[in-house]
Amino acid sequence: AKQYGARVMVDDAHGLGVLGEGGRGTASYFGLEDQVDVYMGTFSKSLASLGGYMAASAEVADFVRHASRPFIFSASIPPANCATALAALQKLEKHPELPERLRALSLYARKGLTDRGLTIRPSALEAPTPIIPIYTYETYRTLRVAAEIYDRGVYVNPTLPPDTPEGEALLRTSYMATHTEALLDEAMDIIGEVMARE
């Protein structure tokens, strides 16, 4: 980017609270925090709220305020949602061990799912993130399996074409630092049992 005079923007929807030192995000994870010009993300993932944020130089922020149609024609988030995101961020700052706990649980889940014979996207096997896709392949099978797993008390997100290539539908599973190994074992047993019958 520097070679061509371009700005570097990181859309870190899934990195904040998960990756990097103390959960500071993707740029921290790769040691590139000082090279990012525009850093943006969402409050709806690790901060348990809604809305989003953008951090940039005053020049870039001013440009976005006056030229970005989505920004111009949207309303501010409600104060309660802003307070929720701030409280979650403060908790993350006070408990920098939470992202490491989340990474450990994610690795535990990856091993547990594969030990139960489930097919995980190869690129996700070693990923340090708490989103683990389980292949189900066929669209209607994916919907049936997701519904049955839900009926047994576990939420998984069915992801279907066009979000995935045709024939590569999957169940997207997500994890939290407050989960326990016992809870994950129970959920993985349910997922494994339902998938084995389908």
Where are these regions (language model features)?
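Catalytic PLP-binding core of fold-type I/II PLP enzymes
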Residues: 1-22
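Active-site core of PLP-dependent enzymes with the aminotransferase class I/II
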Residues: 1-4, 140-142, 182
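Active-site PLP attachment segment
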Residues: 28-63
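Short hydrophobic/aromatic beta-strand micro-patches
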Residues: 55, 133-137, 174-176
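A short glycine-threonine-serine/GTX helix/turn-capping micro-motif
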Residues: 68-77
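Conserved PLP-dependent catalytic core of the aminotransferase class-I/II
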Residues: 79, 86-121, 128, 132-155
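PLP-dependent enzyme catalytic core of the Aspartate aminotransferase-like
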Residues: 151-154, 163-198
